[in-house]
Amino acid sequence: MLNDHLRSMIYDKYIKPTENRRDTYAGIEIELPIINLGGKATDHTVSRAAMNSAVSHFGFQPLKYDDDGNLHEAQDPVTGDLFSFDCSYNNFEMSFARSQNLNDVDDRFRRYIEYLNKNLILNNHLISGFGITPYYRLCRKDYIGYAE
């Protein structure tokens, strides 16, 4: 009798909730290095200009600025995607809002990267997906200063 009661309690707590169909979502965050193709440190003015251009082009809304008034986070009001410089202007971060369709996220990612790199290459920079910048020793180590 007690065994049946315990079995029923365990079933109700752990198994029964899995029987209900739930929607499945994925949230993706990607942080990619901005590389100076001249073998030098990343030029932060180039990084910031590329973000400002992408924010304007894709209709993102500015959210946060650093202590010097530079934009470092913006959000798409339709998709909820975020562009940001999390800790430094050496890496560009894209945070995609939760989605049930990874192909939609992939399409947006490709559009963002293509646009950003078309702008960055004009200043001999590029967003790379191959780990850290090979010139990390040359890059400035200062963090973005801002008050929350």
Question: PLM features: residue spans?
Answer:
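Terminal catalytic/cofactor-binding subdomain
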Residues: 1-148
